[in-house]
């Protein structure tokens, strides 16, 4: 999958070195994947949450962090919408 919005991910990695390795691994896995739909995401990431409008919530580093993306499966792209801790995520309203 092609990832758009990497600047959000890169900025977060620079500011939070303790999660950099896990986010690097997630990025590499996503870039090497081709998902045709949410079922492909769930088969690789069973703990991911699939929301309406093709949004996907990924749990990173033992669910301490979250990455929120919007997937365009037919085009093979994902847009990073948000990156943060689980506690910060709980204050957001993703639907």
Locations of regions flagged by a protein language model:
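Basic, Lys/Arg-enriched alpha-helical interface segments
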Residues: 1-64, 72-79, 87-95
């Amino acid at each position: 999958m092609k990832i758009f919005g990497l600047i959000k991910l890169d900025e977060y990695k620079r500011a939070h070195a303790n999660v950099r390795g896990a986010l690097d691994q997630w990025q590499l896995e996503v870039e090497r994947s081709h998902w045709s739909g949410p079922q492909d995401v769930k088969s690789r990431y069973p703990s991911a949450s699939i929301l309406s409008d093709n949004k996907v919530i990924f749990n990173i580093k033992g669910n301490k962090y979250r990455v929120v993306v919007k997937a365009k499966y037919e085009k093979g792209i994902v847009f990073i919408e948000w990156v943060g801790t689980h506690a910060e995520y709980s204050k957001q309203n993703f639907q």
